[in-house]
């Protein structure tokens, strides 16, 4: 029989009508005289009622046999419910069943299909098709759909063209590790799955498309965490002839539409701007969470005046003040903060409590003679806790930035109802990599440097590594609640400048042509000024849904070992397949 509507949509408008619904048994209760079945589908739950004494024999038997997760087709009359349930949309009605057909039976599930059930992550992933039946997960997945629909509506209306770019690409350096795909036809050669469509979308600009977008899968072989997956989805944009502010304005309008369509929230435009240096110096992060204060203070000048070797020998001394919370932090809890600071590169964590007009505990004996100066500089009041890091500027910012987030959560300083958007602008072009022992591009090698700092790229033989620190980029990141939501930049459209950039990154001209020759050649054929941005769709939906792990908004994600417990991917393949690809495994038995 044809379904009348989704079970979760049957409301008072159907009163006294005979309807048909189909779905899964969420709960079955036999209360002696009556059998109640909660029937669930993607839209919600409706209550089915069967009176064994008055119902047809086959209806009573089907209701008696039904168990959790059986799939049923139910036909019946919609009647007013005696005891209403205001918590659900269908709570004012119930269906008196006149026909029940069991479409499919079910074994006992490995976990209850309901929200807030405690299950191991890998068990949820192994039975993901069951996990997705839970109302919360269905809500997350439908929210993802609503988000992509809103994005497409805006971009289509703004003149963007949706273009698919290839998944089988050339492997290029600079960035995370590639996922490699061996070629059977071209023995010993490999494709790389795209970390982003960066170069392809730039080539679409010189092709004359003017405005491109794509909601696209990307792949990065990197260590996983809550907001990362080996395969992820980004909203990829590129435009010709637009400046930095125009691209930001367009992105703001896109986000504002999504927020209104998906969350019913009106966001204020334009979003605030913060330059990179201020983000690092005051928040200790290039993706600052601006929902709360707890800013970093530079005490270097004052700290050098005290008789404390650790302060005197450090490049900088910075601090955060936890207002009115000194009595909430025991020595043990401060030790935990110290360990976190060390994990972020600091040698240690100095601290004092300000109690009854004087410093106590920690390094208080070294600051006693300068109490008034520190009190005035930090605007201290009674029961404040001060945490210091004395180290290099980068380490002090990083360590205190991490502590800031931890303390913000501990002290309830964060308003989790807020959506605080922010642009971080004026980025450095390069950042030092301890692992590579060289400067690397902070975003990617195709970012346009500012005119004022391009001279520091000069490859005339006099450039020093330290000059690269002075180069600034036309780059911009969009941040939401302490997460990088996306990043973009204006791009280089001059071959000479692009070759200078690659040279600064250590590429010899021959290597540059080997890796990026197709782009360099394209730059000889009238390449327009262009720029763009990519938004992380998974991360955006995660934040809209109020989750802290993108697995909650992806239908079939991987675990933290980049594995799929359901399909057992990745897996060993047959020797014959490897032979066809001319691949021989090293240390196969280890």
Curated annotation (Swiss-Prot):
ATP binds at residues 220-222, 229, 484, 536-539. Residues 198-201 are annotated as: Aspartate. It catalyses: tRNA(Asp) + L-aspartate + ATP = L-aspartyl-tRNA(Asp) + AMP + diphosphate. Gene3D superfamilies: Bira Bifunctional Protein, Domain 2 (3.30.930.10), GAD-like domain (3.30.1360.30), Nucleic acid-binding proteins (2.40.50.140). GO terms for molecular function: aspartate-tRNA ligase activity; ATP binding; catalytic activity, acting on a protein; nucleic acid binding; transferase activity. GO terms for cellular component: cytoplasm. Its EC number is 6.1.1.12. It comes from the Bacteria. L-aspartate binds at residues 174, 220, 443, 491. Keywords: Aminoacyl-tRNA synthetase, ATP-binding, Cytoplasm, Ligase, Nucleotide-binding, Protein biosynthesis. It is found in: Cytoplasm. GO terms for biological process: aspartyl-tRNA aminoacylation. Catalyzes the attachment of L-aspartate to tRNA(Asp) in a two-step reaction: L-aspartate is first activated by ATP to form Asp-AMP and then transferred to the acceptor end of tRNA(Asp). HAMAP family: Asp_tRNA_synth_type1 (MF_00044). Homodimer. PANTHER family: ASPARTATE--TRNA LIGASE, MITOCHONDRIAL, ASPARTYL/LYSYL-TRNA SYNTHETASE. Belongs to the class-II aminoacyl-tRNA synthetase family. Type 1 subfamily. This is Aspartate--tRNA ligase.
């Amino acid at each position: 029989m044809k379904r009348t509507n989704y079970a979760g949509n049957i409301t008072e408008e159907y009163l006294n009508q005979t309807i048909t619904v189909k779905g899964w048994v969420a709960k079955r209760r036999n209360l002696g005289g009556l059998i109640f079945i909660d029937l669930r589908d993607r839209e919600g739950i409706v209550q089915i009622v069967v009176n064994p004494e008055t119902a047809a024999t086959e209806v009573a038997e089907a209701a008696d046999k039904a168990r959790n997760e059986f799939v049923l087709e139910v036909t019946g009359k919609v009647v007013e419910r005696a005891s209403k349930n205001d918590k659900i949309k269908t709570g004012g009605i119930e269906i008196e069943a006149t026909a029940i057909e069991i479409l499919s039976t079910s074994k006992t599930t490995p976990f209850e299909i309901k929200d807030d059930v405690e299950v191991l992550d890998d068990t949820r992933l192994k039975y993901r098709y069951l996990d997705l039946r839970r109302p919360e997960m269905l809500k997350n997945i439908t929210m993802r759909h609503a988000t992509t629909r809103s994005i497409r509506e805006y971009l289509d209306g703004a003149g963007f063209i949706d273009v698919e770019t290839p998944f089988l690409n050339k492997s290029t350096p600079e960035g995370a590790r590639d996922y490699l795909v061996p070629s059977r036809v071209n023995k010993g050669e490999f494709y790389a799955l795209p970390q982003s469509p960066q170069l392809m979308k730039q080539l679409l600009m010189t092709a004359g498309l003017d405005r491109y977008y794509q909601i696209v899968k990307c792949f990065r072989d990197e260590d996983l965490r809550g907001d990362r997956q080996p395969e992820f989805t980004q909203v990829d944009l590129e435009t010709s002839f637009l400046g930095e502010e125009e691209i930001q304005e367009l992105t703001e309008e896109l986000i504002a539409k999504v927020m209104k369509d998906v969350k019913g929230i009106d966001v204020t435009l334009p979003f605030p701007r913060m330059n990179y240096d201020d983000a690092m110096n005051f928040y200790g992060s290039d993706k600052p969470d601006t929902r709360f204060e707890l800013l970093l203070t530079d005490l270097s000048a004052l700290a050098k005046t005290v008789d404390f070797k650790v302060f005197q020998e450090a490049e900088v001394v910075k601090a955060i003040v936890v207002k009115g919370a000194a009595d909430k932090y025991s020595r043990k809890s401060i030790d935990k903060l110290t360990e976190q600071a060390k994990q972020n590169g600091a040698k240690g964590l100095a601290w004092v409590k300000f109690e009854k007009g004087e410093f106590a505990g920690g390094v208080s004996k070294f600051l006693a003679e300068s109490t008034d100066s520190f009190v005035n500089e930090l605007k201290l009041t009674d029961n404040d806790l001060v945490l210091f890091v004395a180290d290099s500027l980068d380490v002090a910012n990083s360590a205190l930035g991490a502590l800031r987030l931890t303390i913000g959560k501990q002290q309830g300083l964060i308003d989790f109802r807020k959506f605080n958007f922010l642009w971080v602008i004026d980025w450095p072009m390069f950042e030092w990599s301890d692992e590579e022992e060289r400067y690397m591009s902070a975003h990617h090698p195709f970012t346009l440097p500012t005119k004022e700092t391009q001279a520091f790229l000069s490859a005339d033989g006099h450039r020093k590594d330290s000059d690269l620190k002075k180069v600034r980029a036309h780059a911009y990141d969009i941040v939401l609640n302490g997460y990088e939501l996306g990043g973009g930049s204006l791009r280089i459209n001059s071959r000479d400048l692009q070759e200078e950039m690659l040279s600064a990154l250590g590429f010899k001209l021959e290597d540059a042509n080997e890796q990026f020759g197709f782009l360099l050649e394209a730059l000889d054929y009238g390449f327009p000024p262009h720029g763009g941005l990519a938004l992380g769709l998974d991360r955006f939906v995660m934040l809209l849904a109020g989750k802290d792990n993108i697995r909650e908004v992806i239908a079939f994600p991987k675990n933290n070992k980049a594995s799929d417990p359901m399909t057992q991917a990745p897996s060993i393949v047959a020797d014959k397949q490897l032979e066809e690809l001319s691949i021989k495994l090293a240390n196969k038995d280890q």
